[in-house]
Structures are given as C-alpha cells and as structure tokens.
Amino acid sequence: MKNAVICLLLFGICLTVSAQEKVETVSMRYETQNDMPLFYQKLKESLTYPMAWGNSSIRNFEKWREEARKVLLDCMQPAPPVAAFDKEVIDIERREGYTVEKILFNVSEYSRVPAYLLVPEGKGPFPAVLLLHDHGAHFSIGKEKMVRPFGVEASVTADADDWAERCYDKQYVGDYLASHGYVVLAVDALFWGERGRKEGVRYDSQQALAANMLQMGMSWGALIVWDDIRSAEFLATLPMVSKDRIGTMGFSMGAHRAWMVSAATDVVKAGAAVCWMNTTDSLMTLTNNQNKGGSAYSMIIPGIRNWMDYPHVASIACPKPMLFINGLRDKLFPVKGVESAFSTMQDVWKGQSVENLLTTKFYDLPHFC
C-alpha cells in the first residue's frame, strides 16, 4: 500500500512538471518581434507597386503622372476644407537686405497658422522657397529651426540657436536664402512650435495624436502634406512672388515634405530634399529606426504602399528640377536603399529625356549632412 501511494505521488509530480513544461512552451510562442509582425518579409514581398511608372499599364507619361497623383491624393483624403488665406501681419523686423514678417494665415478652415515670411529688399517679383522644417524629435520649435526668431522669449531664441548649430552648421537657412534674393515662407507643422501641445512637449503624444486622427478618418501625415500644399498656394498669391519660380526644400522630415509637396502640386516648380529617401524594403527591417512607430506617423500616408513606394511617389515630380542628397554614414537611411531609390528616379527622369534636371548626391557624412 505504501509503495502504491508513493507511485501515485510520483505520477502526480510528473504530470505537474509536464503541465508546467507545456505552459512554458505555450508562453514562449510569439508572432511579433521588435514591434514587427513575423510575416513582415511576406508583407514586403506582396508589395508590387502597380501604380509605379513602368509597372502601371499607362504608357503616356503625362497621363501616368496625372493618375499617379490622383492615387496619392486619394490616399491622403479627406483634405481639410479650404478657407480664404486672409493674411495678417502681426510683427515685422528689418534685417540686412530683407525684412521678416510674422504673419497669420488660414491654411484651412481648421487652422489659422503663424508663419515667418521673409522678403528681400528691392523690386520683385522674386523667386520663392517654401522652407520645411525637420522632425528631429524636437517639437518646441518648428519654423524657428529655419528662420531666426524675433519677438519671442529668450528661451525660444536659445532653443533655435542651438538647433541651427546642431543641424544647420550655425546657419538659419531661411535668412540665408532671403539675403540672397528669395522670398521665404516657413510654417509650423501640426505638433511643432506654436501648433504644439497645450500641455507641453511629449514625444509619445505624437503617436496618440496620429491614432486619434485616424479614428476620426484623417491621417496626421497626410494633413501635414495638405498644409504644405496650401502653404505653397498661399505663396503663389503674394504679389512679390514670381509664381513660375516657387521651390521647396527641407532636411530630414523636411526633405520628405519637400518631395511629397513637389509630387502633389505643380504650384511647386522645383525641390531640394536633404537626407530623406529610401525604399520600403530597406527601411522596414527589425533594426531600422522606421519600425519604432512614433515619429514615423508624421510621414505615413495610409494605403499608398499598396500603389507606390517612396521613389515612385517622388517621381511624380518629374520633369521638375529636383535635388536629393543623402549621407553615406546616415544610420537612418541605409545606403543600399538610397541607391535603389536614386536609381528608380534616375530611370524616370532619363526616360523623359530630362536627366539633367535630377541631381542625386552622396556625401561621406551622417544624417546631419
């Protein structure tokens, strides 16, 4: 009897251990890694980009360009309702060779936005640049990254000076352009500067903002592009601006904005994009910064990857003059992906016999190039 009891106890212990092993085995199952689904490679392989030039059945380039832009704008819907710009000058400062106006204008019915408008001395009309600020995970300033601020608290000026030193070789790009004869418009994107959080800067809130907007049918990334389109259209209404010479430029997220708005509207005649071009295949990996969410939402257009990749969208800008620069030591944008994207765009411009209007350059520099 004693032996039977011992056997039963041992059998029970074995069952318990076996059950624990099964629980542990089950608990080790997973289907995401580094916030990517394990099937992410299959997702990438499924992307055939049917609207890309060369993949599309449309063989007339102008017709393709029209239809590809329509697809892009459809993916960006809904567009914010349009309102009269109703420009208002609220402050002005004269600088050497140009003036800086702090203005307000309606970028949509939803938003009346502050901006800096820089106007060269002399008789216009002048060429103009829509100058688009970066992301930088630095939200306390936006337009002030591009234009030396005035009429602000000392802390804002110090913040802007520090950013110009860190990212722009101590140069306010907007002031440089204005001193060389360009009208410049710099506007905060939603979530930056004077369009930021009432509660104060918080990195994680950009993901919450994006999710909340998606739940109400709108994309944060698309809204930024719509605002940039309207900002370009606003520039074109100004009497001192030569409407046939409106360009755009930006660094990092500003570069993404630059080629996006160049693709989205022909109000923009030329663009320069510094340090933001790649392919989905190279960016969507287990180790790239793009898979962290958060900041990526500011540049996501829902559904567009089912139609076109980044260089395909940028190619809608063809035959405009475009400049793309990337760094060989840029850890955010793998060189292999940049090379592939550059090659895709070069084929498009060359195919339209305007290869001289596309410049793609690498510099042996990191992201801040």
Stretch-by-stretch model annotation:
Residues 110-113, 120-128, 135-138:
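Proline/glycine-enriched tight loop/beta-turn segments at coil->beta junctions
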Residues 343-369:
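C-terminal catalytic histidine-bearing segment of alpha/beta-hydrolase fold enzymes
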Residues 317, 324-326:
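Short beta-strand/loop motif that positions the catalytic acidic residue
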Residues 19-99, 107, 142:
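N-terminal targeting or regulatory segments adjacent to alpha/beta-hydrolase or S9 domains
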Residues 212-215, 223, 230, 270-314, ...:
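Mobile cap/lid helix-loop segments that gate and shape the active-site cleft of serine hydrolases
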